[in-house]
Amino acid sequence: MKLLAVRRLLRIQRVVIRYRLDDLILELPMLPWWLRLLGATLPWRWLPRRKLELTRGARLRLALQDLGPIFIKFGQILSTRRDLLPDDIANELAWLQDKVPPFPPELAVKRIEEQLGAKIEQVFARFEREPLASASVAQVHAARLKSGEEVVVKVIRPNLEPVIRSDIAWLFILARLAERVSSEARRLHPVEVVSDYEKTIVDELDLLREAANASQLRRNFEGSPLLYVPQVYWDWCRPKVLVMERIYGIPVTDLETLRDQRTDFKALAERGVEIFFTQVFRDSFFHADMHPGNIFVSTRAPWSPQYIAVDCGIVGSLTDEDQDYLARNLIAFFKRDYRKVAQLHIDSGWVPAETKVNDFEAAIRTVCEPIFEKPLKDISFGQVLLRLFQTARRFNMEIQPQLVLLQKTLLNIEGLGRQLYPELDLWATAQPFLERWMRERVSPKQLLRNFQQQVEQVPHLSQMARDTLERLSQPHAHNTPPPEWKGSRHDWLGRLVGAVLLVGAAEVGLGQQLEAWPAWVMLAGGVFLILRR
C-alpha cells in the first residue's frame, strides 16, 4: 500500500509539472505569501519550459484525464460545485469524459462467476464478451437469462479499491494542507468536498445500492407516461454485479434520429422538467446523475415521448422541511421578494440564526436583480439556485449535500431541455406544479395525514421536552436550542413553550387516558408549537 502511495505521488508530480499546474496554484489569491515564495523556488521552475497554448481550465482538465479514472470522476463532481469554482474552470471540467479502455472479458467473467457462485453458462443462455460500454468504475455486457429475458450485466472493475483508497488519501492530504495554510481555503471547506466525493465513489462501488435505487425509482413511476426505469433482476444481483432489463431507446442527444421519428421536442423538454419536479416534490427521491449518457427516449409514441433512465448509482432526497423551504424560496425569488428569500434561509437553518436579515436581503438583491433583466423564459433555474448558494456561502451557509445534488441535477435537466427545445420556458412549466404542491400541503387530506404522524410522535416529544427542560434547568446550561430544533431563536423559544405544554399535558391527562379537557388543549398546543415550520 505504501509503495502504491509513493508511486501515485510521483505520478501526480509529473503531471503537475507537465501541465504547469504549479502556475495555477501560485496564482491563487488564497495562497499565503510565504508559500507563494516557496513555490517560486521549486527546482523545475528554473528549467526551460515548452509553451502551452491552453487555458488554465483546459490544462487542469487534461491533467485530471492523465491521472486516471478516479481523478476524472473527482473533476466531474468538482465541476458541479460552481459555488466554489470560477466559471471558466467549471465549464472546462464539465467536458471530462468518464470513458476508459475496457478490461479483459476473462476478468469480467471471472468476477461475475465469483459473485454469483456459478458458472456463466449456468446463469446466462448467452453472454456477450465484448462490452457494450466501459467507464472508470464498471463496464457493461449484454446477455440473455436462461428464462429468456434480454439483460445487461454491470460488473465492477477488479482491483479498483486499493487505487481508490490511495487516490482519496492524497486528495484528503491536499485538502487538509489547503485548510491549514489558508483561511480563504477553509471557507471553501475542501475536506468536506473530498468527503462528499469519497461517499459518492464508495456508494458507486456497491451495486446492490444502485439496484435498490433503481427499484425505488421504477416503483415511483410505475405506469407513468413520463419515465420508464428498467427492471432489476434481484436473483442475480450482488455487491459487484448488477443484472437489469436491457432497454432499447434513442440517446437523448441524438437529435437527428429523434427528428426522423417525428418526436415532439416541446413535449419532450417539458416532460423532463415535470419529471424533475415530480421526483423532488412528490417523491423526495431523485436521480442525481441525469447527464445525457444516462438518458434515452423510447421509440414508442414519439408524439407523446417517454424518457428512459439508467444508472441510478447517485440519488438524492430532501426532508419535508427542505422541500417546503425550497419551494417557497423559488416562488419568492420569482416574485422578487428578496426579504422572504433571506428570512427563509435563516428560518431553515441553512445560514446561521444570527445573520442580519437586512444585510442578507441586500446581498441577494445585488446578485440576483440583474438576472431579471432577461425575459422570464431565458432565466436559468439552475443559475438562480447557484447565485443563491454563492451569496449564502458568503454568510457562512453550511454545505448542504442534498442541495448541491439538486442544483447539479437541475442544471443538467435545464441544459438538456433547452438543447431539445430552445424556447423552453422552465418557469411556466414549473410554477403551476410548485403552486399546486404548496396548496396540497395544506389540504384537509394532507393535514389529517400530518396529524396522524404527529400523534405517533407524542411519546417521543414528551420525553424530548422533559430532556430539554432538564438541560435548561442546569446551573451552567448554555442558552442554546437542542440540535433537533434548528432555525431562528424565535422558532426554538416557541418550541420551548410547546415543551412546557407537552409536559403539562402528560402530567394532567396521560395518566387518565386524556380524560381531562385541559390535557387535550395543552397537548394540541404543544404539538403545534414544536412541529410547526
Swiss-Prot record:
Gene Ontology CC annotation, any one: plasma membrane
Residues the record lists as binding ATP: L132, A133, S134, A135, S136, V137, A138, Q139, V140, K154
Biochemical pathway: Cofactor biosynthesis; ubiquinone biosynthesis [regulation]
Coiled-coil blocks: none
Keywords assigned by UniProt, alphabetized: ATP-binding, Cell inner membrane, Cell membrane, Kinase, Membrane, Nucleotide-binding, Transferase, Transmembrane, Transmembrane helix, Ubiquinone biosynthesis
Enzyme class label: transferase
Taxonomy, superkingdom: Bacteria
Family: Belongs to the ABC1 family. UbiB subfamily.
Role of this protein: Is probably a protein kinase regulator of UbiI activity which is involved in aerobic coenzyme Q (ubiquinone) biosynthesis.
Name of this protein: Probable protein kinase UbiB
Native source organism of the sequence: Pseudomonas aeruginosa (strain LESB58)
